[in-house]
Regions:
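Extended, low-hydrophobicity, polar/charged segments
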Residues: 1-214
Length: 214
């Protein structure tokens, strides 16, 4: 692990904030525990891509936009990650995902499904989803580390694989050697290798699909 503190106004208050530290550590502890190498960059909050690019411009990695959506009934949730310079309107998204009418998920749903607030949506939030899979009756497997299921989960909200979230990923990320996401808080960015990202998805164990986004 490599940690770098970037210049920025008021950066110290974010580094010293215990809640921010806990959210970030939840991700970095998981990566370290599972042998996924990463670089951690601390910076002021980056709530928009425009602001983020000011800090990302000198970091060698593919940086991403991340959306969290729900279906019309509100019983299915979708995470979408794609290269940050691309634009994707909701009608195009509905066509590509083939999941019916979609809308942006509320902050309450973000917290429940990914453990994040608006502006910090990230695939690393799928750690929150790891403890939702329902084991077979005779299974003695322990729940994954660092899982904190906040409330009971209705079976109707789960996909067939026992997870609440389906993940759609920009297929161009397959070609990226290094990929950057927030570690569940927008005061930091984590860079992992393509192989590390794929290993993370395997550990998550949910359903993901590569999609073309122009």
């Amino acid at each position: 692990m490599k940690e770098i503190i970037m210049d920025g106004e008021g950066i110290e208050q974010y580094i010293d904030d215990p809640e921010i530290t806990m959210r970030i550590a939840r991700v970095t502890d998981f990566l370290e525990a599972n042998g996924i190498d990463f670089e951690l960059y601390r910076h002021p909050p980056l709530p928009t891509i425009e602001k983020a690019l000011e800090y990302w411009k000198n970091l060698s990695a593919t940086h991403c936009k991340n959306l969290f959506m729900r279906n019309h009934k509100g019983n299915r949730h979708y995470l979408i990650s794609f290269e940050c310079h691309k634009n994707l309107d909701i009608h195009t998204l509905e066509h590509k995902l083939r999941q019916g009418k979609l809308s942006f998920a509320s902050e309450e749903r973000m917290l429940r499904c990914l453990g994040v607030h608006p502006g910090s949506v990230t695939p690393f939030g799928l750690i929150e989803d790891m403890g939702l899979a329902v084991p077979a009756p005779d299974s003695t497997a322990e729940k994954p580390m660092f899982t904190d299921v906040r409330q009971d989960v209705s079976v109707r909200e789960l996909f067939a694989n026992g997870h609440r979230v389906k993940f759609f990923v920009d297929e161009d990320l397959k070609m990226s050697e290094r990929i950057s996401f927030h570690p569940c808080d927008n005061t930091a960015s984590v860079i992992v290798s393509r192989e590390g990202f794929l290993k993370f998805l395997s550990l998550w164990g949910g359903e993901y699909e590569w999609i073309g986004i122009s």
